[in-house]
Amino acid sequence: MQPHLSHQPCWSLPSPSVREAASMYGTAVAIFLVILVAALQGSEPPESPFPYHIPLDPEGTLELSWNVSYDQEIIHFQLQVQGPRAGVLFGMSDRGEMENADLVMLWTDGDRTYFADAWSDQKGQIHLDTHQDYQLLQAQRVSNSLSLLFKRPFVTCDPKDYVIEDDTVHLVYGILEEPFQSLEAINTSGLHTGLQQVQLLKPEVSTPAMPADVQTMDIRAPDVLIPSTETTYWCYITELPLHFPRHHIIMYEAIVTEGNEALVHHMEVFQCTNESEAFPMFNGPCDSKMKPDRLNYCRHVLAAWALGAKAFYYPEEAGVPLGSSGSSRFLRLEVHYHNPRNIQGRRDSSGIRLHYTASLRPNEAGIMELGLVYTPLMAIPPQETTFVLTGYCTDRCTQMALPKSGIRIFASQLHTHLTGRKVITVLARDGQQREVVNRDNHYSPHFQEIRMLKNAVTVHQGDVLITSCTYNTENRTMATVGGFGILEEMCVNYVHYYPKTELELCKSAVDDGFLQKYFHIVNRFGNEEVCTCPQASVPQQFASVPWNSFNRDMLKALYNYAPISVHCNKTSAVRFPGNWNLQPLPNITSAVEEPDPRCPIRQTRGPAGPFVVITHGGRH
Amino acid sequence: MQPHLSHQPCWSLPSPSVREAASMYGTAVAIFLVILVAALQGSEPPESPFPYHIPLDPEGTLELSWNVSYDQEIIHFQLQVQGPRAGVLFGMSDRGEMENADLVMLWTDGDRTYFADAWSDQKGQIHLDTHQDYQLLQAQRVSNSLSLLFKRPFVTCDPKDYVIEDDTVHLVYGILEEPFQSLEAINTSGLHTGLQQVQLLKPEVSTPAMPADVQTMDIRAPDVLIPSTETTYWCYITELPLHFPRHHIIMYEAIVTEGNEALVHHMEVFQCTNESEAFPMFNGPCDSKMKPDRLNYCRHVLAAWALGAKAFYYPEEAGVPLGSSGSSRFLRLEVHYHNPRNIQGRRDSSGIRLHYTASLRPNEAGIMELGLVYTPLMAIPPQETTFVLTGYCTDRCTQMALPKSGIRIFASQLHTHLTGRKVITVLARDGQQREVVNRDNHYSPHFQEIRMLKNAVTVHQGDVLITSCTYNTENRTMATVGGFGILEEMCVNYVHYYPKTELELCKSAVDDGFLQKYFHIVNRFGNEEVCTCPQASVPQQFASVPWNSFNRDMLKALYNYAPISVHCNKTSAVRFPGNWNLQPLPNITSAVEEPDPRCPIRQTRGPAGPFVVITHGGRH
């Protein structure tokens, strides 16, 4: 793609402030290329080749579109900015902070407008990158909006640049309302800024053809008045028609009410348990005191969508059963509204459209839970920045419960509660890690979607599936124990696979006898009191541990050593036959081999300074 | 510096094999620059601007010279290769391995000779670097030898390149005896290779002027027949004249017998203890059964030199006392001969020349021992790759023992036994790490020298000095305990400082009562037998620990938590007054801030492929 040159292209020397910024890096930047003069009016941009779009801010001032070239390992971004602005910043950071961020900057000194690859330090101060890896291809002003087209390799090997991987990316943005004399004069703390989570590197999965008899069913909340609070989880119960026969869901997609694109953050459809005949109707906030407790039994995920996700197509050889006597007719829709500006009076009927067919596919797709059992035996001390808990699906369980031909995992949804920061599931065979099933090094509990895997993973009998979650409890004063509560923690990977088996749950937790040995040592070693009396519950015991470094390190040592209790279950209550207690931890001797990052060849890059993009002319 | 162009410069296209190698990296390398045609005879190279020289191999086939520009953060290397060779490789790796090394390659396909920045993978297979960071400046053939001049930045930010720091660097070399059709066809395992340890980044310390009355004294072994075994430590006892009055040593330097430069690896001069009137004379291998035990009391380092080191100048305000009634007249010289090719019949009189003066300087320089007490309480489990032990010089000790104005540390010698891999001493004040006193991330017990610090460090009353050593016990089957034996371990930093104080030793070890609690837990938790009977020694207790992950992790947790016994001593046997047992570990809340690596700007680099250096002409 060539830079789009408008009328009046010209060459220009940089202003003193820019020369200064560039010389800080020891470069004598000789010539700056003015690639566009402002106010190109009346010409529409060419039709968009960008399959993915998201609003960056709740007002819809900034909209991002992008496409991905896996061959070239490059992303093209198109950023559209509404209204007259002095400039904009866009970029990525570990968890959405404005500090230590990898940025592209468009700013003006009042005279000229510049584009540059930059970064922010730990105080939010902005600096020019040594390597200009974001490459501007086009800058276009249309009436009252500005459109920037630029590209960047996934990996730049510049230590100041974010490494774009296929997990969650925390995009950051900021709006500059006034000129700055130089890039170094800008600090992100003084700007109107925000973040948006997205998966940038969507997998390239071929789209199976839809059969002729495909039908659709919209699961949507009817005309909700979006509350003017930052976070609302809205719950709505609906039901399938009576005697609805067996179908296969083969695709689903989001339907978002026009104008609310920046407010609807993510949505999920759950099927209720089959153990109850009927569920009460409900339409209101999920945390409402009026919400019937029974709705907690509607937890079986049927569909999940999050901002930026496109339609979800099941592999052509599998479908998800919908209807029939064996499953509940009741469905729960949950919509997460994210309204940080407390916008009032907005009405919404967003939801999910299921595409289903009566022509059943050869395989039924199932969902299996991997990770940790929901139990307080697994706990995280307070004030930890990166504490890891691991759950195992052991070789003995896959040997017993999987078919000889194995299963294929094609999608995955990672799940923790509020302190989760990373999740990974790895497949191991014969004591060696073989491949990553799914991984998110920038996991956010506020951004949960079902992700198609780039490569489906086949799990054979005797394989081990290891799911690890990393937690940050810096802001907690007490230990965080495992459990269902929002202030308790989970570590789960819901894997979507076929053919469906009886195995619904393959998880583990530390053996409780060994945990009691831990509490005993804590007691003896520290000469301090940890309640080990018979009536103390495990959460009470954890609450009385003095969290010195020895007790923290010893808890990690325990979890890395002690035998486990394995839940190799048909349903949450029914285990496969056998004794699953005091199982040894899988002995894994080698880690997954990670390919080296491929640094791009830098032969074609531009000069190591900011580009002048727009010259306003006059005013010197 | 400009490339030296000889007669017949010409442009040439690469041979097919090279084109292949380059295209593997996706580069279309258009043009290769032939910068030298072979066999430039009769012209001497210009006078060498290189202050540092070392032989790379024991035969003296390869000799390296270098200089350092701290301003530009660049090293210039000159590599001289004797005899007709098909090529040579030179580079750096973590600990001298030929795998995962950062290399420059000079090789021929029989027709042309090429130069390239390359790297070896974990199997020793050689690949072209994406970034060509070694830049060839001159290649010159003089009669039967080849001289290469090239430069490289300290830090390249290419993940395949070694980061050159001011610690030990393990240089690697290899000689190519035959042509290879391409770079990728070369594997280091098939070559004649070796390693050499050196400090590349010597500090830029100004050289104080020598006074008029300076005298010299040579401490050298008389006409030693170098044994034809790989490793010999040669011991030689000599003495100062009777009634030798007080002087100050102000400089020392190595005197290496000509022709033995590649065999003399390092040398040290020790002063014997003053507690004995006389020591027996001795001249022989240090491990000889004939060596008198008394010589073990000659341990006070006066001078130390290792390969590549230049003369050692004391700061002009300090000198090391030599002579007088308060110190022993007896000196021990230790010479380490490294003779891996078992060369026979070589005679040697190498040693150290002390430069001393009767005009005493304002301050006496002293040596203080930091790190761990020599005690089995501090132990390393077997089969550990990176186990860290830490010794503390506490605020209470520096408060009591240092003068109000503090002391200045100007040099440091790090010391461990065979399993030591890294050593660092950090200064902390008010609970925060402030600066690194000395650090070697590529420490080798076989390369011990006294190093001048780039910046002298002032230690005030109340400061804490933390010395950590990292050990590798992969090849051990039993725990390695602290102690004097060569198979036991030490963690010591001998710091050279002024003004001299009474504090000779400021070290620590874990409290023995807490270690006994550890053995007790090991016993209870594992239901296994660890001997805790009264007659068991600590080494016996460590020998009976079953080294599962829990007991390993818990030992680390103990050393990071348990109180310590501090040795704040005037001499090894005399403590400063007070109770130094059960002291709390210093509470350090922040680490030393490390500056970001400065990646070089790559604007001026050459094409991303190998250079053709020499065209032999004809033969197609």
From Swiss-Prot, chains A, B:
Subunit structure: Homotetramer; composed of two disulfide-linked dimers.
Post-translational modification: Proteolytic cleavage after the membrane-anchor leads to the release of the soluble form.
Cofactor: Cu(2+)
Naturally occurring in which organism (per UniProt): Rattus norvegicus
Residues of the site described as Cleavage: G42, S43
Enzyme class: oxidoreductase
Record text on cofactor binding: Binds 2 copper ions per subunit.
Listed name of the protein: Dopamine beta-hydroxylase
